[in-house]
Amino acid sequence: MLALDARAEVDRIVDTLRKQVLGTLRRRGVVVGLSGGIDSSVVATLCTRAFGKDKVLGLFMPERDSSGDSLRLGRRVAAQLGIENILEDIGPAVEAVGAYRRQLEAIRTVVPDYGDGWKCKLVIEPVLESNGLNITRLTVQDPEGKVDTVRLSPAAYLQIVAATNYKQRLRKMTEYYHADRLKYAVAGTPNRLEYDQGFFVKQGDGTADVMPIVHLYKTQVYQLAEYLGVDEEIRQRPPTTDTFSMAQSQEEFYFALPYHLMDLCLYGLNHGIASDEVAAVAGLTEPQLQKVYKDIDAKRRAAHYLHARPLLSVEIGED
């Protein structure tokens, strides 16, 4: 259902990137944030094919909650591609804007003892086990390793998300600094599942000049990764958010189903495929599939704000 001709797709994307960056945008090359994940690795590889290794800048932008694997694998990608790369520790900037403090304040409204040595992450209930409500909870781990999960108030949840969103926005500011000084374009890394479902930060990782893989389902990104020779450890690494201090999968935090099932359901919904056929391929019952479809529609409604352009008091006709 999601199989593609990887060679033809790579050739098409590379050709499009050249036309967009060199022609439409009149930039000399591209900046890519390297997270050590599958999406940024594929985008960096595509950009290197399009512009050559001397016209691609890879950025590593860790902070104190980042996994060490992200930097290690990101460096491996840059080394294999032979591209210029820079380490930008955004931790001091995250600290300076008060992101850690604001997150801590919100957490302490539900876990008063939370402090040094503790770790946390946000989690949602798997959609197939839920009653239809996407309720986010906070999981914490104390210095002795004891784990507990508590329900958040709406205000605490929103403040935690708002505070952590600083990280993505500071990374994007850093990307644009280097893009401006080099006269480069910023390449975004969202795939179709993430972009459709709103799994990005407005004016953060959802912002870019070009988005080479935004039309591809996550499953298809993995197909390109294999064709392009992306490092096997990266291809085998489970998708993570790398946002909170506790290790966290994307399905724990947002999608509530493994990406390959979300892809199948989203593809089926987008292409009007009969629900019984989609359910059979995904290994779901019809009621389970309808739960997934309901979740997809709910996230699409929530993502409308993230995709929206600024609203003008008077429409301007000029482009």
From Swiss-Prot:
Keywords: ATP-binding, Ligase, Magnesium, Metal-binding, NAD, Nucleotide-binding. Mg(2+) binds at residues 39, 194. It comes from the Bacteria. GO terms for cellular component: cytoplasm. Its EC number is 6.3.1.5. NCBIfam families: nadE, PRK00876.1. This is NH(3)-dependent NAD(+) synthetase. It comes from Mesorhizobium japonicum (strain LMG 29417 / CECT 9101 / MAFF 303099). The gene is nadE.
